[in-house]
UniProtKB/Swiss-Prot annotation:
Glycans are attached at residues 175, 337, 417, 469, 546, 551, 579, 606, 630. This is Glutamate carboxypeptidase 2 homolog. Zn(2+) 2 binds at residues 397, 436, 562. It catalyses: Release of an unsubstituted, C-terminal glutamyl residue, typically from Ac-Asp-Glu or folylpoly-gamma-glutamates. One of its GO terms (cellular component) is membrane. One of its GO terms (biological process) is proteolysis. It comes from Caenorhabditis elegans. Its cofactor is Zn(2+). It comes from the Eukaryota. Binds 2 Zn(2+) ions per subunit. Residues 1-25 are cytoplasmic. GO terms for molecular function: carboxypeptidase activity; metal ion binding; metallocarboxypeptidase activity. Residues 282-597 are annotated as: Catalytic.
Length: 770
């Protein structure tokens, strides 16, 4: 019994196993005593309970966790990494199908149970690999003066020899060509478009030039198309991806910085999941609720041609732009001292055109699922996940995570086989397909099994990829913050330099590099979008943890993000040079979290902390937001009244959470006295599991994203990578600002009331009676 209380042995076995026989010999027990012990074991569990052994439950958990961590080996991670990144493997291709079955094979060989794939038929997008996309600049006389390559060059042939690996493209870009003046719009945020208009520059009928960073690329294109652009170009600025300079000695493969023809690929879909089957799983036998034309009309798929270019091509465009200089915070480092201008058009009458070759196709994708069944609560799921599809080789995103997850599975099964440890709750391993196109595999899975997940899933723990080598970085919901912090204290710091400075654990460096304003706490953000945790939290109300390793930098992600240069060379020689010690630490942290949630008697969920965050952080933020609404005094009083009622409910939640904490303490004490009577434990844990579900609004909180149903933490409408606190309230305020009507005012109040209803739901969930 993995989570038995004081009195359990550190190595528990079957009563008929060899270790048990040795124990009987060692203690020279009488036959009567043996009979009693055997009877007790048969009645209760295959795991022993010896009242003479004073080992505590914490000792047992720490010992088992230590064995699992010791069993995680870097040589295995390296082996898996090379297997999974041998070829380019875009979702929907035979190469990615092969990776799926290699993952399934690795998990099966490790000993996971019921390893299988789950297929879906989804709309994907591919370029014409025989005809690269291009940017062409012609003189006023019609002579071609510049043409982009459209293909990134091979730099390490042993790892980058796949056919078409260098092709530069963006999924779901509109097929076709566009010729027009160019307008520079910085990062393409909502404020950037607003400021461009204030500066008197019109984007209608133009080609938008935008930098990567500060938001999801699909949102940039969505805004550009809404503003009337007929095409768009995205480029990486050297101030983000080549900070040491663009010379060969300062970029890949000498350093981690992007080389001069590197390009970030990605998806432009505005939303998550299959574009043609919102709300429902995209199974072959089910009807598609939306057509391609409707998806374009709804803004889910772009209609205009779009392509990514290198900073070398970006320079060729920027140096020709006419018009007034861009604002200082719109300037970058492409071309060194080059001053970015807004346009429209070029100074010397030259003309630009873009040619994009893109095709939409329905393809089969497949998720991979495997289990370690729990010995006590097999219907309680601790879910671990990572996606495996990549834009090219994907050795960083995502297959650094894929390799680590395979090793976590192997190490756990090794521990099970060599000791008597087995998790109390079921650990589910998930490898998602087509994440890069818009979280498709995970979203379809959640849509298919949402009712089961809301009953069985305890937590979903996601690790997309390893982004740096300095510090752990964790996003999670407030109810899980204590758990992620405590787990980080149990894993040794992978950096020798950090350990020499007295920072022995992941927690120590995390606290140093990413401190919160609150003393003694590392910075933890609410999860946004951009990876497979999003549908679990936003659609199903399953609490999530999304973690990685990062550097303390000013750019959004690592410089080689979504380039063809993500091959094992980058992991081993540029990113994690001490024998993949960061990869190993990531695996140890993943395993520590999984084991904690699988084996802790009471689930490590803290509703008191959540209530405190609600009162001290979320409500003051909401108060500031509603104070800025332009309404009459009487109308504002109506809003303020509803806000006060929400505040009262949040205070009730804090009071009830403190009372519920007393119930938890009583339950833990009772369990330590009689670990074979878990009914009180089950009652407490069922309430804890249900709290996050209270915030799911079946009607949704976003018109644009059907996966957004969480009234507190749904993904932002303006940036799919970010979370939006109380998105329904914010969306109602935005709508009112555009069209101030009485109905719009009532909707603001209604959305505040919906948040209050969810808080009341948590209060009622924690009560003993209705």
């Amino acid at each position: 019994m993995p989570y038995v209380g004081v009195g359990a042995q550190t190595v528990s076995t079957s009563l008929t196993g060899a270790p048990m026989v040795k124990a009987y010999i060692a203690i020279a027990a009488s036959l009567i005593f043996v009979f009693c012990i055997a009877a007790l074991g048969v009645h209760h569990s295959e795991r022993k309970f010896n009242k003479f052994n004073k080992v505590s439950i914490d000792d047992i958990h720490k010992s088992d966790a230590g064995v699992i961590q010791d069993n995680i080996k870097t040589e295995n991670i390296k082996k898996y990494l090379r297997i999974f990144t041998k070829d380019p493997h875009v979702a929907g291709t035979e190469a990615n199908k092969k990776v799926a079955y290699e993952i399934a094979n690795a998990w099966s060989e490790a000993g996971l149970e019921d390893v299988h794939t789950l297929p879906y038929e989804v709309l994907l997008s591919y370029p014409d690999f025989e005809n690269p996309n291009s940017v062409i600049i012609k003189s006023s006389a019609g002579k071609e003066v510049f043409k982009s390559k459209g293909v990134s060059p091979v730099i390490i042939p042993d790892e980058q020899s796949g056919k078409y690996a260098g092709h530069q493209w963006l999924a779901y870009a509109g097929n076709g060509s566009a010729s027009a003046d160019v307008v520079y719009i910085n990062h393409g945020t909502a404020n950037d478009f607003k400021n461009l208009k204030l500066m008197g520059v019109d984007i209608k009928g133009k080609i938008a030039l935008m930098r990567y960073g500060h938001g999801f690329r699909g949102d940039k294109i969505h805004k550009a198309q809404q503003a009337g652009a007929i095409g768009a170009i995205l480029f990486s600025d050297t101030q983000d991806v080549a900070q040491d300079g663009v010379e060969s000695e300062n970029v890949y493969p000498k350093k981690i910085w992007m080389p001069n023809e590197g390009v970030q690929r990605g998806s432009l879909m505005h939303g998550d999941g299959d574009a043609l089957s919102p709300y429902y799983p995209s199974k072959k036998e089910l009807f598609k609720g939306r057509t391609i034309e409707e998806a374009k009309e709804d803004g889910v798929l772009p209609s205009i041609p779009v392509l990514p270019v290198s900073y070398t091509t970006g320079y060729e465009i920027l140096k020709r732009l006419s018009g007034r200089p861009a604002p200082s915070d719109w300037q970058g480092f492409v071309g060194g001292n080059l001053t970015y201008k807004l346009g429209p058009g070029f100074v010397n009458g030259e003309k630009l055109s873009i040619n994009v070759h893109s095709e939409l196709r329905t393809k089969r994708i497949r998720n991979v699922i495997g289990y370690i069944r729990g010995s006590e609560e097999p219907d309680s799921y601790i879910m671990l996940g990572n996606h495996f599809d990549a834009w090219v080789y994907g050795s960083i995103d995502p297959n650094s995570g894929t390799a680590v997850l395979a090793e976590v599975a192997r190490a756990m099964m090794q521990t099970i086989n060599e000791t008597s440890w087995k998790p109390a709750r079921t650990i589910v391993f998930n490898a998602w397909d087509a994440e890069e196109f818009g979280l498709i595999g995970s979203t379809e899975f959640v849509e298919e099994f949402v009712n089961i997940l809301q009953k069985r899933a305890v937590v979903y723990i996601n690790m997309d990829c390893i982004q740096g080598n300095i510090s752990l970085h964790v996003d999670t919901v407030p109810i899980l913050e204590h758990a992620v912090i405590e787990a980080s204290k149990q894993v040794e710091n992978p950096s020798k330099r950090e350990r020499s400075r007295g920072r022995k654990t992941l927690y120590d460096t995390w606290m140093k590099v990413f401190p919160d304003k609150k003393a003694g706490v590392p910075k933890i953000r609410v999860p946004g979008g951009g990876s497979d945790h999003a549908p679990f939290l936003n659609f199903a109300g399953v609490p999530v943890i999304n973690f990685t390793f990062k550097n303390y930098t000013t750019w959004d992600t690592y410089p080689l993000y979504h380039t063809m240069y993500e091959t094992p060379f980058s992991n081993i020689h540029l990113l994690d040079t001490d024998n993949l010690s960061v990869h190993k630490a990531i695996g140890q942290y993943w395993a520590e979290l999984a084991k904690t949630f699988a084996d802790d008697v009471i689930l490590p969920m803290n509703t008191t902390h959540f209530a405190s965050v609600m009162l001290k952080t979320y409500l003051p933020q909401l108060k500031t937001t509603i104070s800025g609404i332009n309404v009459s005094r009487s109308d504002f009083e109506d809003i303020r009244t509803q806000y006060a009622l929400l505040s009262k409910s949040a205070q009730d939640l804090l009071t009830m959470s403190k009372k519920f904490q007393e119930t938890i303490h009583f339950t833990q004490h009772s369990f330590s006295q009689n670990p074979y009577d878990p009914k009180h434990v089950n009652a407490v844990n069922e309430r804890l599991k249900s709290t996050e579900r209270c915030f799911i609004n079946p009607r949704g909180v976003s018109m644009h994203n059907p996966s957004a149903r969480h009234v507190l933490f749904s993904v932002s409408d303006s940036d799919s990578y970010s979370s939006s606190l109380m998105a329904g309230v914010q969306n109602a305020i935005n709508s009112y600002d555009l069209n101030p009507t009485k109905k719009g005012l009532r909707e603001i109040i209604n959305q505040i009331s919906i948040v209050q209803y969810s808080v009341i739901c948590v209060v009622n969930t924690l009560r003993d009676v209705i």
